[in-house]
Amino acid sequence: MVTIRLARHGAKKRPFYQIVVADSRNAATGRFIEKVGFFNPTAQGQEEGLRLDLDRVNHWVGQGASLSDRVAKLVKDAQKAA
């Protein structure tokens, strides 16, 4: 089953997440099909906290991909901001 989920990157105590489309059987930070954005929870000031390609997200959801709980909330926030 294909899911759109967060893959953690960054340094210790400085999380940075790639939003990826991946097979649910693969490891959380392992192989993925496509990157569709990023999420930086520690963004301050002028730093970009969220970038999401909503066209690609909608494409994958149309193909049957499921969203993780956190990504679903981020997509909702991105759609509200757009």
Curated annotation (Swiss-Prot):
Gene3D superfamilies per the UniProt record, alphabetical: 3.30.1320.10
GO biological process: translation
Annotated SUPFAM superfamilies: Ribosomal protein S16
InterPro entries the record matches: Ribosomal_bS16, Ribosomal_bS16_CS, Ribosomal_bS16_dom_sf
GO cellular component: cytoplasm; small ribosomal subunit
GO molecular function terms attached to this record: structural constituent of ribosome
Coiled-coil positions: none
Pfam families listed in its UniProt record: Ribosomal_S16
Keywords for this protein: Ribonucleoprotein, Ribosomal protein
Keyword Ribonucleoprotein: yes
Family recorded in the similarity comment: Belongs to the bacterial ribosomal protein bS16 family.
Protein name stated in the entry: Small ribosomal subunit protein bS16
Source organism: Vibrio campbellii (strain ATCC BAA-1116)
Gene for this chain: rpsP
